[in-house]
Amino acid sequence: MSGFPSDLLAGERYAVCGLGRNGTAVVQALLGMGAEVQAWDDRNADLPAQPNLTVAPLTDLSGMTALILSPGIPHLLPKAHPVADLARAQGIQILSDAEILYRAVRKSGSKAAFIAVTGTNGKSTTTALIAHLFTTAGRPCAAGGNLGTASLALPLLPDDGVYVIEMSSYMLERLDRFHANAACLLNLTPDHLDRHGDMAGYAAAKAHVFDNMGPDDLAVIGMDDDWCRAIASQVASRGVQVVELDADALPPYDGPALPGRHNAQNVGAALTIASHLGLDEAAIRTGLKSFPGLEHRLQKVAECDGVSFINDSKATNAEAVSKALAAYDKVMWIAGGVAKAGGIESLAPFFRHIAQAFLIGQDADVLAATLETHGVPFQQCGTLEKAVPAAFKAALDENIPVVLLSPACASFDQFRSFEDRGSHFLQICDNIVKSGHSGTNPTQKQED
C-alpha cells in the first residue's frame, strides 16, 4: 500500500508520455491518489481500463496540471518530442515523477526528509548505501528514482522517514519545487551530451539537485573536476552548507562490497549525509559493515582456481572503468559494445593494470585501435561466450588473479541492458565453476 490518501490529487489532471517501467508505475500512482490521467506511448500504449484513465494520443494538453515524460524521452535535445513542444506552446509544466512525489508527500502533511544523489558515476552505489544505513538504523526509509523503483511508486513515509532519490540529469531538468534536505553531486565527466548539448549544459542540469536549498540543508560535492568545483562555489554563495570531498584525500575503505579508492568517496558522501540527518556513529558503523553492495558494480560473482570474476557491467564509460582498473593490480579485462564519445583514450594511465584485453561487441575495433597504439595485448573475441573462457585461460596461464568485465561501452548491440549483460557474464562464470574447476559462486546464496 502506498499510504497516500486516495483523494490527494482529486481534481488534478496529468498527461503521461512513455509507458515503460517508470511510466506505468507513474500512471498507477497518480490514479491511486485520485488524479485523472491521460497516457500514451508511441510504441506500446497497452494499459488495462481503469476509472479516471484515458489511453489516447496526447494531442491537446489544455487543463492539464503537468506533463510527465519518461526519463528517456527528450524535451529539448537532440530533438524534442512533439508532446514536449505542445506542452510549451500550451503553457503546461514538464515535470519528473520525483517532483510529483515531493509535492504529494508535502501535501499529505509528512515532514519526511529528502536526500538526492547525482553524479556521472557512483550515484547508484551511494544511493543504496545511504538507504541501507537508515534502514539498518531503524529509520523508515524508501529509495528509488533512477535506481530501481520509480520515485512516485514509493510509499508515504512518516515525519521521521527518509526518501533517498537517485537523480539522473534527465530527472533534474524537470524539477520545480523539489527541495532536498541533503544532496550529493559526486563527480562530472562527459556523458549524455546529445541530450544536453555540451558539457556546460550537462553540468547545469546536474546543478539543479541543489535548487531550493537553504542554510539548514547540506550539499556534499566531490572536488575532483572543475565543473563540480565551480558548482560548489555557486552553492556555497547561496548560504547552503557545503562539504567538499576530495577522493585522493580520503582514506580508502577496505570493505569487500566497496573495493577501490573511488568507493571511499561514495562512502564519505553517504556517511556525511547520514550524520547530518541524525544517525550516530555506532549506527553508521553497523550499517556500513553489513552493506552487501550492488549488482553489476564491481560485484564478485565467482572464484575459480584462484581467479576472481568481477562483474562491473554498469561501467559503460571510460571514467567508470578507470575506477575499476585502479581497484586491482592486474586484470584480464573484458570490454566492448557500443563505444561512447571519446572512446578509451583517457584510460591510457590505467593500461598498466591490464595484462590482456578481450574485446566484444560492435565497436571492438575502435577499442583495439587504441590498445594497439599503447602496446596493450588484446584478443578479438566478439561475444562474452568466447571472451570469458579465453580470459580465464589466460589468467591461469599468466597467474593473473582477476577477470574483470568493465565494458566502457553501452550494451544495446548485443544485450537488452547493462543488467542483461552482467547476468550473461554471471551465467558464463557459473558454467565455468560447474565444469569441474575448483571454484565458488558468491552470488548463489543471494539467488537461492
From Swiss-Prot:
Biological source species: Gluconobacter oxydans (strain 621H)
Catalytic activity: UDP-N-acetyl-alpha-D-muramoyl-L-alanine + D-glutamate + ATP = UDP-N-acetyl-alpha-D-muramoyl-L-alanyl-D-glutamate + ADP + phosphate + H(+)
Superkingdom, taxonomy of origin: Bacteria
The protein's annotated pathway: Cell wall biogenesis; peptidoglycan biosynthesis
Binding of ATP, residues: 119-125
InterPro entries, alphabetized: Mur-like_cat_sf, Mur_ligase_C, Mur_ligase_C_dom_sf, Mur_ligase_cen, MurD
UniProt main location, coarse: cytoplasm
Name of the protein: UDP-N-acetylmuramoylalanine--D-glutamate ligase
UniProt GO BP: cell division; cell wall organization; peptidoglycan biosynthetic process; regulation of cell shape
GO MF annotations, alphabetized: ATP binding; UDP-N-acetylmuramoylalanine-D-glutamate ligase activity
Compartment(s) of residence: Cytoplasm
Database matches in NCBIfam families: murD
UniProt record similarity statement: Belongs to the MurCDEF family.
Record keywords, A-Z: ATP-binding, Cell cycle, Cell division, Cell shape, Cell wall biogenesis/degradation, Cytoplasm, Ligase, Nucleotide-binding, Peptidoglycan synthesis
GO cellular component: cytoplasm
EC nos: 6.3.2.9
Its job: Cell wall formation. Catalyzes the addition of glutamate to the nucleotide precursor UDP-N-acetylmuramoyl-L-alanine (UMA).
Membrane-spanning intervals of the chain: none
